[in-house]
Amino acid sequence: MNKKILFLGVGGIGVSALAIAAKRLGAHVAGYDSVANKLTAKLEALGIVIFTSPNGVDVANFDIVVYSSAILSSHPLLSQARSLGIQCLQRAMFLSVLMKDFSYSIAITGTHGKTTTSSVLATLLCQLDKYSSFIVGGVVKYADSNIQVNGTDKLVIEADESDASFLFLSPQVVIITNIDLDHMATYNNSYQTLLENFTDFVSKESVKSIYLCVDDQGCRDLLAKYNQSDKNVTSYGFSIDADVQIYDYHIIDEITHFKIRYKGDDLSFKLQLPGRYNVQNATACIIACLDLGFKYEDIRNALIKVTGVARRFDLYTKVISGHQVTVIDDYGHHPVEVANSISAVRDRYPNKKIIHVFQPHRYTRNRDLIKDWPKALSLADQLILLPTYSADEQIIKGAESQDIVKGLSGYLLADGFDHAIYFLEKLANENTVILIQGAGDVTNLVEILSE
């Protein structure tokens, strides 16, 4: 990749990964972000020049400008690049360009679990094939990074459906974890439009193999809608009609055990990640690796080393009011993700009381899923509900935190982190496990607990 590329919004995890990948593939790279952070410091340590002011950036010196969704079209650097006729590419559009440098790419998409599934497959392939690479939307714990370029053989990517940008991508393999109602403004609040976009994605000429979880109704709807016979379509899940069925799921000493029935063979696996949903995610990756020709024993040995992705069921032990308490930090922010996480906590800690500290994320999500929240938020033994993290949205009347628990009783409404800690100090002991959850800044509560 012999190009000079300027990355705008390079302090974000997605664009920073592309900048690193481009540099390792031979491009001359520079970046801009209005605020320096740990990611920009990492880029500078790799020899990438970082600008924090538009002043001094010679846009005319670049062949391509790549920008994140956080960069407005009116941004002076982007406007200048366009006026100069420089090629300007949104993040996913540039990823599609980058993919051409690799001989084989696998895209993971879906409403929930795509980052975790991407991290599982990335961890497996980096052990099974030293020339495999990945670019995903979270920090893969195995590599302590969201990006690794080891060669140009196989590339694992996370394909984002939230803004329909996955339609820019042309992979050879697609894994779909599920199709659910979220980010529906992208799809004009139409489930059929959402399905049509997924259909368009898997119908691309480049796609040869598709893996779908048939435990999910959205994936079943896609299968019913999809009628092309020129691709290898494999369904997986606990369902008895799955092409690859999962069974014998159980936990021993906090290790997840399960089996799959693959082409007539019964194969057993162990996984450090908790919950049925992570078994589903792992199964998709296992099948993809088996179909690529990797040996069962090698996959089995690699899978037990998978530790997932940062902020997905991260485990800590904290001293709270003199008690040693297990605390889990999790990114889940949709009713389905909340329900899955609480189920996983129950499976792993069947004899402990679950205290769920939840920070809703976006008023629009509260509003759009208002009927689904009460059931999901009733599943723990005790709910502590924080104010909604706005993500720069305006408050929507009838869609605040107290509105998503209408009909529930016994929950505690905290007005902030200090108030939540006050409740935790009263409630927590060795017989409790605390699940701190949300996509906003609630992860900071984990750090505060240790102070």
UniProtKB/Swiss-Prot annotation:
Its main location: cytoplasm. It is an enzyme of class 6 (ligase). Cell wall formation. It comes from Francisella tularensis subsp. mediasiatica (strain FSC147). GO terms for biological process: cell division; cell wall organization; peptidoglycan biosynthetic process; regulation of cell shape. This is UDP-N-acetylmuramate--L-alanine ligase. Disulfide bonds: none annotated. GO terms for molecular function: ATP binding; UDP-N-acetylmuramate-L-alanine ligase activity. Pathway: Cell wall biogenesis; peptidoglycan biosynthesis. Its EC number is 6.3.2.8. NCBIfam families: murC. ATP binds at residues 110-116. Keywords: ATP-binding, Cell cycle, Cell division, Cell shape, Cell wall biogenesis/degradation, Cytoplasm, Ligase, Nucleotide-binding, Peptidoglycan synthesis. It catalyses: UDP-N-acetyl-alpha-D-muramate + L-alanine + ATP = UDP-N-acetyl-alpha-D-muramoyl-L-alanine + ADP + phosphate + H(+). It is found in: Cytoplasm. The gene is murC.
